[in-house]
Amino acid sequence: MGNNVVVLGTQWGDEGKGKVVDLLTDKAQWVVRYQGGHNAGHTLVIDGEKTVLHLIPSGILRDNVKCVIGNGVVLSPEALLEELKMLEDRGVPAKERLHISEGCPLILPYHIALDAARELARGDKAIGTTGRGIGPAYEDKVARRGLRVDDLFNMETFAVKLKEVIDYHNFQLVNYYKVEAVNFDEVLKQVQSVADLLISLVIDVTDELDKARLRGENILFEGAQGTLLDIDHGTYPYVTSSNTTAGGVATGSGFGPAHIDYVLGIVKAYTTRVGSGPFPTELYDGVDKLDPAGKHLGTVGHEFGATTGRLRRTGWFDAVAIKRAVQLNSITGFCLTKLDVLDGLEEIKICTAYKMPGDKLVDVPPMSAEGYEQAVPVYETVPGWTESSFGVTSFDALPKNAQAYVRRLEEITGIPMDIISTGPDRNETMIQVNPFN
């Protein structure tokens, strides 16, 4: 029988999932996206060539791997076309191996207009969305007014539904946000131009994945964003609009949850966050917090968002937040990324508890953003190392203090570091346990 493996982020996103998915797909026949949209930014470096994917699963760069966009993904036709063209310009025949669920909600221009208008209206309380219409598209889905891929099979009915939903949103855009209305004819024309392509990619995802499972094929589920951005379990309201945790796999793809064999949690050797929201171990944001160790993490780690281009906020490893990720996702093993970024630091800190109001010590995080904001990190300090760990592919070849750091993280989290990444390239990795074996 094959193995069904989930790869997801355990922090606030940007953990290095794209590289790991690409690495593991040499043993996978299918790679499935199950949540999010083109707000994801998965960076892959293969033989020095960098590719950033936002919507299409990272497995597309492997020959013979079928890639699926599941019903839990909100799909921007415009973003999909751009990505297909970029891949085809590089000689990757993406259309031949890409499939989509007809249950995918569509992201259309009025979603992007709403996203921008709302962030502007929030002023300094802005959530820090990517501005790509993700939240408003999920909102329409839950309100049952969203248009989906399956609506494209009847363009006459689609046009009627589109007119209703555009009228609904234009009322808000014009009268509340005082911005320009979205033009119905332009949106309809845009959708008509891509409808045939989208329809040609449709498969029954639940049925095809179940058949693949019964044939003993390996299926990899590729998460986007990170656990602490989950709509239900993250630092609400500074979260994304989908379930980024392992529970989202079943609802976002139609794959039975009992068939998942292994959950690989991607975790950076330190912590980063893009945009607004609480961050207990934060050291550096380029504005108010300017700790030199945090600046080192951001500079050496090239911490700029793959989707937004924004500087990421940086901080120490937060084992308290990670404990929640372990609980939420039933993590089997970790992949530790960017260990090499810590090279050259004299000492490294690990947050092992939060001090809450009243001097109460906790080892699991609060539920609310307000609770996170009140948390004061309690640190354990370990020695750093001066030797290079960059590109090292054997655990024993790592600097001794780097080995000790990895082992200490395993002790604190209770989860083995099955994979360790020491550089951006596919080859700069040590796989101690392969989830597909």
From Swiss-Prot:
Record has ATP-binding as a keyword: no
Domain of life: Bacteria
Membrane-spanning residues: none
Protein name according to UniProt: Adenylosuccinate synthetase
GO cellular component, as recorded: cytoplasm
UniProt keywords, alphabetically: Cytoplasm, GTP-binding, Ligase, Magnesium, Metal-binding, Nucleotide-binding, Purine biosynthesis
Binding residues for substrate: A306, T307, T308, G309, R310, L311, R312
Function text: Plays an important role in the de novo pathway of purine nucleotide biosynthesis. Catalyzes the first committed step in the biosynthesis of AMP from IMP.
Cited Gene3D superfamilies: Adenylosuccinate Synthetase, subunit A, domain 1 (3.40.440.10), Adenylosuccinate Synthetase, subunit A, domain 2 (1.10.300.10), Adenylosuccinate Synthetase, subunit A, domain 3 (3.90.170.10)
Gene giving rise to this polypeptide: purA
Active-site residue numbers: D14 (proton acceptor), H42 (proton donor)
Residues involved in IMP binding: D14, E15, G16, K17, N39, A40, G41, H42, T130, R144, Q225, T240, R310
Complexes and interactors: Homodimer.
Taxonomic source organism: Psychromonas ingrahamii (strain DSM 17664 / CCUG 51855 / 37)
The protein's Enzyme Commission number: 6.3.4.4
Stated family: Belongs to the adenylosuccinate synthetase family.
A Pfam family per the record: Adenylsucc_synt
Keyword set includes Secreted: no
Amino-acid positions noted as binding Mg(2+) in the UniProt annotation, renumbered to this chain: D14, G41
Catalytic activity as recorded in UniProt: IMP + L-aspartate + GTP = N(6)-(1,2-dicarboxyethyl)-AMP + GDP + phosphate + 2 H(+)
Main location class: cytoplasm
Compartments where located: Cytoplasm
